[in-house]
């Protein structure tokens, strides 16, 4: 098997403006900064306020001969930011994005989504579609994605192969679903459901056997409790206990209709937190998508167990209802929060669009709570799209910002030079870098993303 693609044979070096987050409230904008990436793709040095005349000395201090590799001097209106992290994405829904507006969640699944996902029984269709999906996300600067695949084992393996071949960091999960889906699109029985997930986990371990830092890992993925009976949930809980390095992802308190059906199926449990905890699927490795309607006890449980929330503001507000997750309250309680495109329930794969919608819905929440939950700032939304997402995915020791020792997953953003200026607000001569950064976040798009790096390797198509 081929190992994960790595950086080129030479280090990378940059001088210019570096922007990243250390916490939800600590955004660092670092002008005149020297950043050095070693040949393995790790950040070796980050030195703010660097005079260009001292760069050769810094290179030598880090063990390299000056002039052996070029230093990229970022133009005045350009900067580096960490790669975006999509904490919730349905890769098989790539071609159905934007469809089914106005439908309830369960009707959307039954009338549109299950039929589309069933197409992935065809491995050639899976290869074409997953290749396009991963290329598309990389173009948007999404360097890491947590993917739900379909129920098909062969197609799920293809998604993992595509991610690694194209250099995207990914969590890939085979969807477990043995009930409340059409007979032509559900697992044959509970035993088969758990068995195929076990096989996928083992396959990924063998897939990564020659790589001590794999980009692609498996994630345990019960679609939601409605689609999994107790035998499946119990079996997946056992897999989670036996594979302590793996994340767990599911949909959690997404819509009132879904929550009511879950209560009917599992009447012995007071709420979803108790349900998933009972089966060993709720802990610090859990990535819980949506989390709209949590009871007080559930919030306390998520905080105590250090669970992560994948906030999906586009899909939450563009289907049948306008649903607003209490993100400010989650942050107040120290609950990990990242952003998810939720493609294709979400119509956009742009993390810039997701950030903007997170800002919008938090403003609605502030109005709803009469100011008790203040709106998120633009800087906080940027944190959620980068370091917050890394925390949710259990990758913050490796990516999410430019701390020395982390891997260089980054976007080179251009706001003026060589960029079509018909969408982003024009950058004017007197604009401070803080103003330029906000213009990019609020009015920019993928045309402003000149380069995308994963572990030091340029990957944008």
Residue ranges, per PLM feature:
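Divalent metal-coordination and catalytic microenvironments
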Residues: 17, 35, 77, 88, ...
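His/Asp/Glu-enriched, well-ordered alpha-helical/loop segment
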Residues: 17, 278-285, 327-426
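N-terminal metal-binding scaffold of metallo-dependent hydrolase/deaminase domains
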Residues: 1-69
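Active-site gating loops and adjacent loop-to-helix segments of metal-dependent hydrolytic enzymes
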Residues: 95-126, 179-190, 255-285, 305-308, ...
């Amino acid at each position: 098997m081929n190992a994960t693609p790595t950086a080129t044979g030479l280090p990378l070096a940059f001088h210019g403006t570096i922007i990243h987050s250390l916490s939800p409230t600590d955004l660092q904008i670092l002008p005149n900064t020297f950043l050095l990436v070693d040949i393995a793709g790790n950040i070796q040095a980050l030195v703010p306020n660097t005079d260009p005349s001292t760069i050769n000395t810094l290179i030598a201090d880090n063990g390299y001969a000056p002039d052996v590799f070029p230093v990229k001097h970022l133009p005045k209106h350009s900067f580096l930011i960490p790669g975006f992290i999509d904490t919730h994405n349905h890769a098989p829904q790539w071609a159905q994005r934007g469809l089914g507006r106005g439908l309830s969640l369960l009707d959307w699944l039954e009338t549109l989504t299950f039929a589309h996902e069933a197409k992935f029984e065809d491995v050639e269709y899976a290869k074409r579609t997953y290749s396009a999906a991963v290329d598309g996300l990389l173009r948007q600067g999404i360097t890491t994605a947590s993917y739900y695949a379909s129920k098909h084992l062969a197609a799920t393996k293809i998604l993992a192969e595509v991610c690694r071949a194209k250099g995207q960091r990914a969590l890939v999960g085979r969807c477990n679903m043995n009930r409340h889906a059409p007979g032509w699109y559900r697992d044959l029985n509970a035993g088969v459901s758990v068995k195929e997930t076990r096989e996928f986990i083992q396959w990924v371990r063998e897939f990564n056997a020659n790589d001590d830092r794999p980009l692609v890992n498996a994630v345990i993925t019960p679609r939601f409790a409605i689609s999994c009976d107790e035998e499946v949930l119990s079996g997946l809980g056992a897999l989670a206990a036996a594979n302590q390095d793996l994340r767990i992802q599911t949909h959690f308190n997404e819509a009132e209709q879904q929550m009511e059906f879950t209560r009917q199926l599992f009447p012995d449990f007071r709420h979803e937190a108790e349900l998933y905890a009972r089966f060993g699927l709720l802990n610090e490795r859990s990535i819980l998508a949506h989390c709209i309607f949590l009871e007080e006890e559930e919030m306390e449980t998520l905080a105590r167990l250090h669970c992560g929330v994948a906030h999906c503001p586009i899909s939450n507000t563009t289907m049948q209802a306008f649903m607003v997750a209490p993100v400010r309250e989650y942050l107040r309680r120290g609950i990990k929060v990242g952003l998810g495109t939720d493609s294709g329930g979400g119509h956009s794969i742009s993390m810039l669009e997701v950030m903007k919608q997170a800002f919008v819905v938090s403003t609605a929440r502030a109005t709803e709570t009469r100011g008790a939950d203040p709106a998120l700032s633009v800087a906080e939304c940027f944190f959620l799209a980068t370091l917050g997402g890394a925390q949710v995915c259990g990758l913050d020791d490796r990516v999410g910002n430019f701390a020395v020792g982390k891997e260089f997953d980054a976007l080179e953003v251009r706001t003026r030079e060589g960029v079509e200026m018909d969408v982003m607000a024009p950058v004017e001569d007197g604009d401070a870098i803080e103003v330029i950064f906000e213009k990019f976040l609020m009015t920019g798009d993928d045309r402003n993303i000149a380069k995308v790096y994963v572990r030091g390797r340029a990957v944008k198509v």
